[in-house]
Structures are given as structure tokens and as C-alpha cells.
């Protein structure tokens, strides 16, 4: 213990004055994002007396009396603690620490005053800046900072304020002593005095550097740099104030824009969205206007030009209506050159009733056998052929006689020059004969009557002539002008006379055409052939058609790759009145479409796209127009219970598909109708099966077959594919299938009456009526009605029918029996029981 005590009070440890002068402290540095670092600071000071320090202490400029008052009590308060501190500090060390503490308080007061002065000046600068911007509105560029320590986020100073020289000020009063200690490399008193003097002088002329200067130099903004000591936010930048002023100025000077009236170009059909864009209006505004008019539409709905014009006028615009068909100008109805007109062969259409021998007559003329190639021996296509008689050519067009091919006959009559009406001598005038007469009269073409089958014993040509008079067809033998020829396709009798009559009629008509102009004609038939693509049978009416010509037919266009005549030979040109097959169409045109040759492929594509768009828009417009209101839709669903029979039809040619669709439309009634989901020329593909599966449709193939992928897909999905080659069979099968969708007819048959004589109440059975059969008979399982005072009060079925104690199947008139009803016991004496039987009968179309 004595040794330890002696160690503590040894002379060596008490006389270490050098270590007491070297002061050690720890400073905690704060960085952005919450990072800190502890730094050890050692300060070496020289021992100086208190009197010298007092003499050298500078007096503050603003309030010189404050320093001695604040430093003295602190010094006196620290003195009593010296004896009781039990520390080894000398008086010089204590005085040095007190001096440092006093200096810190002086610097804190100076910095606080400088901060207040700087806040006042910043407020004045901001106020003057706002007034300057409002008055002059001149762009000012912020002045460059002279030193990095003076970087601030406040606007640039005025010229008077910018003359103040900046000075380095510690960032916070808390770290002032630490920063000065860090900068003090020497412990001389004159350095400390000069630094204190500079701080005192800076009170008057030094503006305070904002707290975020160092952080701004680093390129990062922290929470400490964003707020100053009093918690006030940073000032707005000059660019922000300028933007705010410009925005305010625009708002003050903004005037309501006048509505601009535009000239809106309206085609035949247009969508609501496109109409709004052409008017520079919003689609929502147009739809609101239509809603006020009672029409519910969407931006993608198509409207016609009349509705679009009303909308445009309502919105204050002018309208200029144009026709998109302008692209078709100049391709049809081109005037022929009279000097280049030449005689052309006549186009003759063979018309008449089915099985009257039209195709057989044409075969006899051509010396061919077309009938054997047609399924069922009936013509289901339009055939175009050319024969030669006495060096003159005649073009024949054979039309079907079946009732389903009305459209084909109408097309044949429109493109013809002469109509040959074939009437069977043993069958006389029939419905399709009358229809053919009407088609020929509507087309305005002359008629030549060919009375066929005169070789039959039952032939009666005079009866044919007489019946034709009822339809205003006056033959020459009856005093008229219509030529008539009695022929026999089987024996070839009088075929030459028929051809001579045709040539005579053509000579009377004086048929001419210009072969040197561009070709123009009509599509007779079209189909999709495997290996050859789309094949169109056309009749050239004007001009000459060559390979590599660009043609437009209906909604399709193409470049002619090959021309094939009726004998299957490739030809180099097709002159007027020539039937020809064209290869190279981009798609399959519709039968009856007109075709023409155009000069450029771009024009052909433009015309085809216009026609496709027109057809598509019209279809959409029809659907939109039939939409109706919600009340109409609901009432229609409640009142109409029409069942639909969906079908997908694929045929070999467009004409056959058209005939099938026309025949199926006639089968419908108020209960069931056929709906053709899709129809096209060509074979049955896998996409057709997928469509049938989605729409629950049956697939019909007319003279076509399904490929292997389609057959496998149909087998997997359970889709039925039916093949037909005769239109009779197809229509009959569809008719029978549609008849099955109709609800059966209920037919009631009266059986008999029985009078209730007594009512018995039997256990486990209930009430049983003892009856006497007065009329007819009573059968078990028949329907019964309970009649009381000539009013039917119950209708149901018999539960029990007994005679004496035995169950019987029927009871004849005049016999007594016991009758019990199912789920009904309100029977009385004197009631009449009527029995009947209901028969369900399937109805047909």
C-alpha cells in the first residue's frame, strides 16, 4: 500500500507539464446518410498568464459590455471546484481550459448575431427579387460564386449586396472549437489573437454561408443541409420563381378560344372515331350527342354519310361529301371507237325447266356429252361453250333449270344477246319455264322457242304453242314474231334450223364490238381449284383480253397467268363474245361480278381494297342498325322463339353455293330457320372444322371433300361432315333435320264420359268414385277431366280403374266401375269424368 501511494504522489508524475499542455479530445464527425466517424484531436498550447489573455481579448463591436459579464461568472464558478476536483491539473491547465471555454462562448454569440443578420438580409434580398421580377420581367443570370464555400441555393444578390466580401464561417456553433483546433498548426498566441480579431471584424461585413454549401459541393442534399438551425425551408430558385411568374401571366392573359369551323370530308361510311378526328373533336363528345338522340354507339361503330353530316353540322363544321367510288372511274363504260367496231359472235343462253333437255340439246350441238359429267343428270353449273356454224361462231351459255338456280338464270339472261327457251313437247310449260320467260323479258333480249323431245309419242307441240300465248310469247305459227323450232336433242332433228335461226336473229341485232380497246366483261362462274388456285370463267364482252393483263373482278384483282378456252386449250387472246377461263386471280370473285382491265397494279389493288372495305363497312352498318334499343331486344327474345340450324357450306363453285343458300333460306318459318355461318368455294379444311366446333354447326360439302387433317379433326371433336353432289338430296336432308327442331303437334282424341253415382272413402287409397260409363269407354292411363256444372275443375290422370274388385284396362259404355284420381280427391256425386288421349305428331316443313 505504501508503495502504491508513493507511486501516485511521486515527483515524476506530478511534474509532467508537457503532457498537460497537450490536450486530447474526441470529435464525432457527421456525414450524409447517417454516417459518423470519431476523430481524436490533440491541441498543444503555450502557458500564458490570465492578465495577458485579458489584455489580448478583443472586445465585440456591437455589444462590448457582454463579454466580461459572461466570462467572469463562469471563471468564478469554476474556481471553487479546483480544490474539490481531486485532479492532477495545474492552475495553468485550468486557466487554459477556462480561456478556451470563454472563447467558445464568445464565438457562439458572434455567430448567432451573424446568423440573425444574414436571415434579415436574405429576407430583404428575396423581397427585392420578387419586386424586380414583377416590374422588369428580365431574365437574370445568377452570379458565379467566388469561392466554393459561398455556394448557396438562394437567388443571386443585388449589386449592392454582392460587394460584401465573403468569409469562412464555421458550419455550426457546436463544432467551432473543433474546427479551429484542427486548423491550428501552431500554438502561438498571436495566431489565436489574429483569428479572434478576424471573427470580430466579420460581424459587420461577412454574409453567412448557408448550411448546405458543403453538401452542395458534394452534389448531395441531406436533411441537415435542407433545413437551417431555425427549421426554415430553403429558398426557391430563380428559375422556379420565373416559371411560376410565367404560368401566372399565361393564366391571366388566357382567353377562351374561338371554335374553328373546318371542312369535313365525308365518305359513304365512316366510323365515329374517324369522324371525331376529322372534326378535331373528342369521340366522347360525339357519342354523348348520339346518346341524346337516343342511339347507343361505340367509337368503332360505322355510320353512314347522312348521320355523319348531321353530327358535323351540329358541331359547327361544314361538310363536303365525296364518293369513294371515284377510284373506279374510267374502268367501265368506256366509249367505243365507231370506226373500229367489228361484228362479234352472238351470246346465246339456253333456258327452260329442269329435265326439259337443255344440256342434251347443247351436247348435240357441240357433239359432246356434258350430261354424263353432271351428278344426277342435272346441270348445277353455268357452262359456257362456243360452236361454229358456216364459218360463224356462236357462244352458248347453259343455265340450270332447277328452282334453286334462279340467280344463275338471271345472270345468264343479263349477259346474253339471245335467249333460247327450251320447252319439252311432252311436258309443256312448267314453273321454271315461266320464270325463264320473265328473266328474258326483264333483260330485254329476244326469245327463240325450241320445242324439244318431238320424237316422243306423247309429244304435243301445239299444246306448247297455246300455253305460251298465256305468257305473252307469240310464235310465228300463231301470228307472232318469236321464232320457233321443233328439235330433238336425242336424234339431232332440226338442229341446223335452230342454229340458222340464231344466226338470223344475230344478223337482225347487228352485234358489234371494238376488239382493240381494253377488255371488259362479266364473271360467269368462279371456283377454287386445287393446284391452279382461283379459276374464274368469264365472258369477254368488249375488247381483247391477253395474258399478263391486270384485271379487277368484284372485290378481287389479279394478273392473268393463262387463258384456257372451253376445250381446255391455252390461247393467247380472248376476243369479244368469247368464254374463257382465267388463272391468276388473288381471290375467288363472285359469280356475276363485272371485270375490267386496268393499267397499273397499284390501281387494281386500290380498287379491290376499296370494294372490300365498302362491303365490310356495309355489313357492319347493317348489324349496327339492327341492334335496336335494350327494350326491343328483350321483347324480341321473349316473343320470338325461333330456333336456328347453323350450317357451314363448302362447294366447288360460287354459283352452287349461292343456289344452296337461296334454297335453304326458303325452308325457314316462324319456328325454325337455317343460318349459314360460313360459305366458300373450295375443299373442307381444318379451319372449317374449328369454326363448326365453335358455332355448333354441321359441315356440308357439295362436290368437294375434306382433307386428311380436317377429317382427323372432325373425328376428334365429333363434328359431322356430310357430302352431297345433287342439290335435291342436300335440300331434302336439311329439311328433314330442321323439321326435327320443330316442337311436335299435340292432337287430342276423345275416349268417353262417366257419371259419378257414389263416392267411397277407402283406407290406404282415399276417395274412390263409383261411376257409370255413359259414353264411349274409359281406359287406364288416359287423361281425365273432372267437370262440375259444365266447368272443368281438374285435369290429370287416372290412378285406379276397377270393375268390382279387379283392376281392368278399360270399361265399356253402360258398365259401372271405380275410378280414383292421382293427387286429387275433391270429387262429388253428380260430377262428370271425361277421358281423352293425347297423340304427338311430328311436323314437317
From Swiss-Prot:
Q: Which Pfam families match?
A: EF-G_D2 (PF22042), GTP_EFTU (PF00009), GTP_EFTU_D2 (PF03144), IF-2 (PF11987), IF2_assoc (PF08364), IF2_N (PF04760)
Q: Which residues bind GTP?
A: 352-359, 398-402, 452-455
| Regions of compositional bias (Polar residues) in chain numbering | 156-165
- Tell me the InterPro entries matching this sequence: EF-G-like_DII, EFTu-like_2, IF2_assoc_dom_bac, IF2_II, IF2_N, P-loop_NTPase, Small_GTP-bd, T_Tr_GTP-bd_dom
Q: Where is this region: G4?
A: 452-455
Q: Where is this region: G2?
A: 377-381
The free-text function statement in the UniProt record for this protein reads: One of the essential components for the initiation of protein synthesis. Protects formylmethionyl-tRNA from spontaneous hydrolysis and promotes its binding to the 30S ribosomal subunits. Also involved in the hydrolysis of GTP during the formation of the 70S ribosomal complex.
This chain belongs to which protein, by name? Translation initiation factor IF-2
Organism source for this protein? Bartonella henselae (strain ATCC 49882 / DSM 28221 / CCUG 30454 / Houston 1)
What is the taxonomic lineage of the source species?
Answer: Bacteria, Pseudomonadati, Pseudomonadota, Alphaproteobacteria, Hyphomicrobiales
Gene expressing this chain? infB
Amino acid at each position: 500500500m505504501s508503495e502504491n501511494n508513493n507511486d501516485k504522489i511521486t515527483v515524476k508524475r506530478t511534474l509532467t507539464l508537457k503532457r498537460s499542455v497537450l490536450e486530447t479530445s474526441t470529435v464525432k464527425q457527421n456525414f450524409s446518410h447517417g454516417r459518423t466517424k470519431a476523430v481524436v484531436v490533440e491541441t498543444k498550447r503555450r502557458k500564458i498568464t490570465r492578465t495577458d489573455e485579458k489584455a489580448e481579448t478583443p472586445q465585440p463591436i456591437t455589444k462590448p459590455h457582454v463579454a466580461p459579464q459572461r466570462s467572469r461568472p463562469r471563471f468564478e464558478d469554476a474556481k471553487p471546484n479546483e480544490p474539490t476536483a481531486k485532479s492532477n491539473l495545474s492552475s495553468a491547465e485550468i486557466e487554459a481550459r477556462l480561456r478556451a471555454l470563454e472563447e467558445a462562448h464568445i464565438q457562439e454569440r458572434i455567430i448567432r448575431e451573424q446568423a440573425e443578420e444574414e436571415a434579415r438580409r436574405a429576407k430583404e434580398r428575396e423581397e427585392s427579387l420578387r419586386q424586380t421580377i414583377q416590374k422588369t420581367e428580365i431574365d437574370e443570370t445568377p452570379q458565379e460564386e467566388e469561392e466554393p464555400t459561398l455556394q448557396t441555393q438562394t437567388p443571386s444578390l443585388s449589386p449592392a449586396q454582392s460587394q460584401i466580401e465573403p468569409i469562412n464561417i464555421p458550419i455550426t456553433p457546436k463544432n467551432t472549437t473543433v474546427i479551429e483546433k484542427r486548423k491550428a498548426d501552431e500554438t502561438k498566441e498571436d495566431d489565436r489573437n489574429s483569428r479572434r480579431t478576424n471573427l470580430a471584424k466579420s460581424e459587420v461585413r461577412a454574409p453567412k454561408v448557408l448550411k448546405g454549401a458543403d453538401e452542395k459541393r458534394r452534389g448531395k442534399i441531406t436533411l441537415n443541409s435542407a433545413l437551417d438551425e431555425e427549421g426554415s425551408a430553403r429558398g426557391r430558385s430563380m428559375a422556379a420563381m420565373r416559371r411560376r411568374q410565367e404560368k401566372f401571366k399565361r393564366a391571366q392573359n388566357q382567353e377562351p378560344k374561338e371554335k374553328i369551323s373546318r371542312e369535313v370530308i365525308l365518305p359513304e361510311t365512316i366510323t365515329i372515331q374517324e369522324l371525331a378526328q376529322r372534326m378535331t373533336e373528342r369521340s366522347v363528345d360525339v357519342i354523348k350527342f348520339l346518346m341524346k338522340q337516343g342511339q347507343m354507339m361505340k367509337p368503332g361503330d360505322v355510320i353512314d354519310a347522312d348521320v355523319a353530316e348531321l353530327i358535323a353540322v351540329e358541331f359547327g363544321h361544314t361538310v363536303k361529301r365525296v364518293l369513294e367510288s371515284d377510284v373506279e372511274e374510267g374502268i367501265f363504260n368506256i366509249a367505243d371507237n365507231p370506226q373500229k367496231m367489228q361484228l362479234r359472235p352472238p351470246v346465246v343462253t339456253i333456258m327452260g325447266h329442269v329435265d326439259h333437255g337443255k344440256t342434251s340439246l347443247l351436247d348435240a350441238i357441240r357433239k359432246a356429252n356434258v350430261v354424263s359429267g353432271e351428278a344426277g343428270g342435272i346441270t348445277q353449273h353455268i357452262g359456257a361453250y362456243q360452236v361454229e356454224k358456216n364459218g360463224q361462231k356462236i357462244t352458248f351459255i347453259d343455265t340450270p333449270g332447277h328452282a334453286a338456280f334462279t340467280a344463275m338464270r338471271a345472270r345468264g339472261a343479263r349477259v346474253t344477246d339471245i335467249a333460247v327457251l327450251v320447252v319439252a313437247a311432252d311436258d309443256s310449260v312448267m314453273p321454271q319455264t315461266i320464270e325463264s320467260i320473265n328473266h328474258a323479258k326483264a333483260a330485254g333480249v329476244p326469245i327463240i322457242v325450241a320445242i324439244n323431245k318431238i320424237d316422243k309419242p306423247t309429244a304435243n307441240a301445239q299444246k306448247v304453242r297455246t300455253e305460251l300465248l298465256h305468257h305473252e310469247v307469240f310464235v310465228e305459227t300463231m301470228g307472232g314474231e318469236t321464232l320457233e323450232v321443233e328439235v330433238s336433242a336425242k336424234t339431232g332433228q332440226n338442229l341446223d334450223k335452230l342454229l340458222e335461226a340464231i344466226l338470223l336473229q344475230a344478223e337482225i341485232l347487228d352485234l358489234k364490238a371494238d376488239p382493240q380497246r381494253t377488255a371488259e366483261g362479266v364473271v360467269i362462274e368462279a371456283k377454287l381449284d386445287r393446284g391452279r388456285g382461283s379459276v374464274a370463267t368469264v365472258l369477254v364482252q368488249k375488247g381483247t383480253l391477253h395474258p399478263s393483263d391486270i384485271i379487277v373482278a368484284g372485290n378481287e384483282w389479279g394478273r392473268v397467268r393463262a387463258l384456257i378456252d372451253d376445250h381446255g386449250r391455252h390461247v393467247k387472246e380472248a376476243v369479244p363474245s368469247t368464254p374463257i377461263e382465267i388463272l391468276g386471280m388473288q381471290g375467288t370473285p363472285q359469280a356475276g361480278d363485272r371485270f375490267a382491265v386496268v393499267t397499273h397494279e397499284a390501281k387494281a389493288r386500290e380498287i379491290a381494297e376499296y370494294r372490300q372495305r365498302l362491303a365490310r363497312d356495309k355489313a357492319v352498318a347493317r348489324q349496327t342498325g339492327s341492334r335496336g334499343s335494350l327494350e326491343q331486344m328483350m321483347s324480341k327474345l321473349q316473343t320470338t322463339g325461333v330456333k336456328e340450324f347453323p350450317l357451314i357450306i363448302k362447294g366447288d363453285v360460287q354459283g352452287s353455293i349461292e343456289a344452296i343458300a337461296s334454297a335453304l333460306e326458303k325452308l325457314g318459318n316462324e319456328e325454325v330457320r337455317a343460318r349459314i355461318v360460313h360459305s366458300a368455294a373450295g375443299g373442307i379444311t381444318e379451319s372449317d372444322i374449328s369454326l363448326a366446333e365453335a358455332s355448333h354447326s354441321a359441315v356440308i360439302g357439295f362436290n368437294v371433300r375434306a382433307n386428311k387433317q380436317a377429317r382427323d379433326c372432325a373425328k376428334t371433336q365429333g363434328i359431322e361432315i356430310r357430302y352431297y353432289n345433287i342439290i335435291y338430296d342436300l335440300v331434302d336432308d336439311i329439311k328433314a333435320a330442321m323439321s326435327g327442331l320443330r316442337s311436335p303437334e299435340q292432337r287430342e282424341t276423345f275416349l268417353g264420359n262417366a257419371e259419378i253415382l257414389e263416392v267411397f272413402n277407402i283406407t290406404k287409397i282415399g276417395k274412390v268414385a263409383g261411376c257409370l260409363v255413359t259414353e264411349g269407354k274409359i281406359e287406364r292411363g288416359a287423361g281425365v277431366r273432372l267437370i262440375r256444372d259444365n266447368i272443368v275443375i281438374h285435369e290429370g290422370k287416372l290412378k285406379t280403374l276397377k270393375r268390382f274388385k279387379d283392376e281392368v284396362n278399360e270399361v265399356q259404355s253402360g258398365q259401372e266401375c271405380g275410378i280414383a284420381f292421382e293427387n286429387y280427391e275433391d270429387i262429388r256425386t253428380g260430377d262428370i269424368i271425361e277421358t281423352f288421349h293425347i297423340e304427338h305428331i311430328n311436323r314437317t316443313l
